[in-house]
């Protein structure tokens, strides 16, 4: 038996499709539209109802938990909070101010104190991790490699507990991801007419717990790169969630984009 804490993005849906009917599980559905509500093993609760969540785990005699998908940082003044939530809420709010990585670490620690072990988010889906190498026909040139170096350098300088998992480097200019996500980052850059240049680097946050919240990319990410006039996408060895692999590589080859894993 495993407890699945599911948030937004297609990653939880992929896990669900793979394990349904094969594994014993239950779902804590934190999606806005309650995507998993039709599953009889799904529970809809508030992030602040920690006591209820822990009670469900104990009722199911479940000792393992898997986090997948994005959970939007809640408005703490409006969420439902139970007694155990009240006990933990001040620590959660304090850590949330340090960034997503610190908040997730605190939540993992809370479950650990309740003797519930957090497993890697790719426990059921190791095929979504990519190893080092180039996955498309197109390869980065000398200028692309300079852009890659600059983007990685900028990410390494970022605070260990912040939300930054992505950077776009183009012509010695860096655009960093904010807590609004990758899509918002793309809105900040303009396509240079008839010229392809620049790269998107998606790495985990510095010193984050790699069991949760790995950067998720896929076909939509590559389409955003193409629309922005970028040359390619750079990922970290076995530290990303890569969805739509076959379609993504086909799209990259068709549009002369590189997919590099370092």
Task: Name every feature range the model reports, one short phrase each.
Residues 6-11, 70-74, 172, 240-241:
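Gly/Ser/Thr-rich loops at beta-strand to alpha-helix junctions
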Residues 1, 21-24, 61-63, 114-116, ...:
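Short coil/turn connectors at secondary-structure junctions
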Residues 1-30:
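N-terminal basic/disordered segments at the start of proteins
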Residues 31-37, 42-55, 59-62, 80-92, ...:
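Feature captures the catalytic cores and cofactor-binding loops of soluble hydro-lyases/lyases
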Residues 4-6, 27-28, 65-68, 118-123, ...:
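General beta-strand structural signal in soluble alpha/beta enzymes
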Residues 11, 97-101, 107, 114-226, ...:
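Conserved mixed alpha/beta catalytic, RNA-binding, or beta-rich assembly cores of soluble enzyme
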């Amino acid at each position: 038996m495993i407890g699945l804490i599911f948030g937004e993005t297609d990653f939880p849906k992929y896990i669900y499709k793979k394990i349904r009917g094969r594994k014993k599980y239950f779902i804590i559905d934190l999606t806005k539209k309650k995507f998993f509500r039709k599953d009889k093993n799904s529970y809809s609760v508030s992030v602040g109802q920690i006591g209820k969540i822990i009670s469900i785990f104990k009722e199911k005699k479940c000792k393992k938990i898997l986090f997948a998908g994005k959970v939007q940082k809640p408005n703490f003044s409006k969420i439902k909070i139970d007694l155990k939530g009240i006990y933990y809420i001040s620590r959660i709010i304090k850590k949330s101010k340090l960034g997503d990585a610190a908040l997730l670490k605190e939540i993992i620690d809370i479950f650990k104190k309740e003797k519930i072990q957090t497993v890697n988010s790719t426990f059921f889906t190791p095929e979504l991790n990519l190893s080092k190498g180039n996955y498309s026909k197109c390869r980065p040139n000398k200028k692309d490699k300079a852009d890659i170096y600059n983007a990685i350098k900028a990410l390494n300088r970022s605070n260990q507990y912040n939300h930054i998992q992505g950077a776009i480097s183009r012509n010695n200019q860096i655009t960093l991801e904010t807590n609004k996500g990758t899509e918002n980052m793309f809105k900040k850059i303009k396509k240079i007419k008839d010229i392809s240049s620049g790269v998107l680097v998606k790495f985990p946050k510095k010193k984050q717990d790699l069991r949760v919240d790995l950067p998720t990319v896929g076909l939509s990410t590559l389409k955003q790169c193409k629309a922005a006039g970028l040359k390619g996408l750079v990922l970290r060895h076995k530290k990303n969630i890569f969805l739509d692999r076959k379609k993504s590589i086909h799209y990259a080859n068709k549009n002369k984009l590189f997919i590099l894993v370092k």
